[in-house]
């Protein structure tokens, strides 16, 4: 979740949750088994993130000391973490992929996300069946 940038794992107190998410994302996305697969990244709990950054500076977290700021700025914080996830990719091609900043309790937002997900699945299926060119 986007809001977990200042939290540690319950099972490994020294491991930052966002760092763990970045490492897992990198591992999955750069696996050859997924080389022809579109990527959908959901950065959830944007509502909690928006509240949390008012009191918990991103740059104050050791793994994210390079956050340029400004502090307490929702959009800058979101863009910073989106870039962190993009930086995990060996192949910089994010054309057929989508990043969604979500709040699961926001029905309008989730409706848009589900529509985008359907589009990704249909596009991948059309590509695999030969109706669309390869990436």
Language-model-detected regions and their locations in the chain:
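Conserved GTP-binding G-domain of TRAFAC-class P-loop NTPases and closely related GTPase folds
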Residues: 2-135
